[in-house]
Swiss-Prot record:
This is Tryptophan 6-halogenase ThaL. The record marks E358 as: Important for activity. The lineage of its organism: Bacteria, Bacillati, Actinomycetota, Actinomycetes, Kitasatosporales. The active site is at K79. SUPFAM superfamilies: FAD/NAD(P)-binding domain (SSF51905). Its EC number is 1.14.19.59. It is an enzyme of class 1 (oxidoreductase).
Length: 531
């Protein structure tokens, strides 16, 4: 008996639907018919999208799509980090950093560069020892990453001849990425695109989906169904009746107001990073692209009404709220109890969502697709495959949820009800353990210093996504320091001397690259052929 899956039906287009179609088309080597049912009248969510570095290696390279090709088609720009602004000082939202008591500006970066090490101890721990002993007042991201100097100068992460200088991710227009991948999947992989609206889910006596009925009367039969219908979860939550686990007891923000803001690139340059600007009831993203930046104020409607949030957002950028077209979104925070139920797999917003504080949304999509391809079933839908897939998605999501909550919980801000309420939320045991590990001076998660092992291996990165460097960037950036230096360093004078050479090398590399790299604006103009 032939138990192979013959047809996969994907409900929903957008970024999640077309990434899924394109990836499965490649992974299944054209042995399975793939159909995307996309309602043309459903508006797409998103004003600017930010990503993480493995997007090219884990997704576009796998599809054989060169970086420059999709970047040109999707108005993409470069992202070297998230820059956090005013997460420690009280006050209303402002793109201009305030000043801390120690004289530093209230900013810190979470870059993608990997930490060097001396005697198998990451440079973060030598920096912490120096800082705690009063031997330096340099911030962690400045001392340990050459990328910070590059970003401060608004330089690009690549040379004009396109040689790579450092690690980076991307900003892009999500609707253009969806359109690009739709064209790729339909023309290169023979994916069938059905523009119609689903009206009914047909199931058998076991509760398995057998087909989707459309508004025009078509019956789309399939063996495996992928729900990319967004927050509505039309298959996983409605048809499969799988409960969505609300996690607003960990993360308070549940709404956003967004728009695109014109920008004079020639006068002001283009920033090669995403900005995260703390507000009185949440935070605002800024995603630079040529000629404009996408921006959105993420907030909790328990602490600000839609009108109040819109006014605060408008004031931040000097917008006229009466003459600006805003995109208002209310989102659910959390995940499905199970991402895969019977023969229905949820991907993207239909599966899980956390606010885009660390740009995890697109990553969640292709991580889920990667895991689906790895656990791809036959018609018996082996319980072990399904359960292991669900465990992978659950652990991926919960780890990111905890990492994001730490941003709020350990911020010293208590100037508004929103910031005070974040201190009253319960932390998961896993993040408590990481904080105690950090406070004791030990590395958090596996320290990663080998880019080939980390960025070149999706499985390794998936299981250690938020690295020791990530936790150091956030904890130290928010002013949370280890109680004491790593005790073992007291016995390693030669290693400390080696670390000093590494600190000097970081500064030297940063200075050299600032002098030799083009501005982000100039490189993007070259890439996009702008006159």
């Amino acid at each position: 008996m032939d138990n192979r899956i013959k047809t996969v039906v994907i409900l929903g287009g957008g970024t999640a639907g077309w990434m899924t179609a394109a990836y499965l088309g490649k992974a299944l080597q054209n042995t399975v018919k793939i159909v995307v049912l996309e309602a043309p009248t459903i508006p797409r969510i998103g004003v600017g999208e930010a990503t993480v570095p493995n997007l090219q290696r884990a997704f576009f390279d796998y599809l054989g799509i060169p970086e420059e090709e999709w970047m040109r088609e999707c108005n993409a720009s470069y992202k070297m980090a998230v820059k956090f602004i005013n997460w420690r000082t009280p006050g209303e939202g402002s793109p201009d950093p305030r000043t801390l008591d120690d004289g530093h500006t209230d900013t810190f970066h979470h870059p993608f560069g990997l930490l060097p090490s001396a005697d198998q101890i990451p440079l973060s721990h030598y920096w912490a020892a120096k800082r705690l002993q009063g031997e330096t007042d340099e911030n962690f991201d400045e001392a340990c990453f050459a990328d910070t100097a590059i970003m401060n100068a608004k330089k690009a992460p690549r040379f004009l001849d396109m040689r790579r200088a450092t690690n980076y991710a991307w900003h892009f227009d999500a609707s253009k990425v969806a359109a690009f991948l739709r064209n790729f999947a339909v023309t290169k992989q023979a994916v069938e695109h059905v523009e119609d609206e689903m009206t009914e889910v047909l199931t058998d006596e076991r509760g398995f989906i057998t087909a989707l009925r459309t508004k025009s009367g078509r019956i789309l039969q399939g063996d495996l169904f992928v729900d990319c219908s967004g927050f509505r979860g039309l298959l996983i939550n409605k048809a499969m009746e799988e409960p969505f686990i609300d996690m607003s007891d960990h993360l308070l923000c549940n709404s956003a107001v967004a728009t695109a803001v014109p920008h004079d690139d020639e006068k002001n340059g283009v920033e090669p990073y995403t900005s995260s600007i703390a507000m009185e009831a949440g935070w605002t993203w800024k995603i630079p692209m040529l000629g404009r930046f996408g921006s959105g104020h993420v907030y909790s409607d328990h602490f600000a009404t839609q009108d109040e949030a819109t006014l605060a957002f408008s004031k931040l950028w000097g917008l006229d709220p009466d003459n600006t077209e805003f995109n208002h979104v209310r989102f659910r925070v959390g995940r499905n109890r199970r991402a895969w139920v019977r023969n229905c797999v949820s991907v993207g917003l239909a599966s899980c969502f956390v606010e885009p504080l660390e740009s995890s949304g697109i990553y969640f999509i292709y991580a889920a697709i990667h895991m689906l391809a790895k656990h791809f079933p036959d018609k018996t839908f082996d319980k072990v495959l399904v359960d292991r897939f669900n465990r992978e998605i659950e652990e991926m999501f919960d780890d990111t949820r905890d990492f994001l909550q730490a941003h709020y919980y350990f911020s010293p801000r208590v100037d508004t009800p929103f910031w005070r309420a974040n201190k009253e939320l319960k932390l998961a045991d896993s993040i408590k353990d990481k904080v105690e590990t950090y406070r004791a001076g030990l590395p958090v998660n596996l320290p990663v210093t080998d880019e080939g092992t980390y960025y070149g291996n999706f499985e390794a990165e998936f299981r250690n996504f938020w690295t020791n460097g990530s936790y150091y960037c956030i904890f130290a950036g928010l002013g949370l320091m280890p109680r004491n230096p790593l005790p073992a360093l007291a016995y390693k004078p030669q290693s400390i001397a080696e670390a000093e050479l590494l600190f000097a090398d970081v500064k030297r590399k940063g200075d050299t690259l600032v002098e030799s790299l083009p501005s982000t604006y100039d490189l993007l103009r070259q890439l996009h052929g702008a006159s």
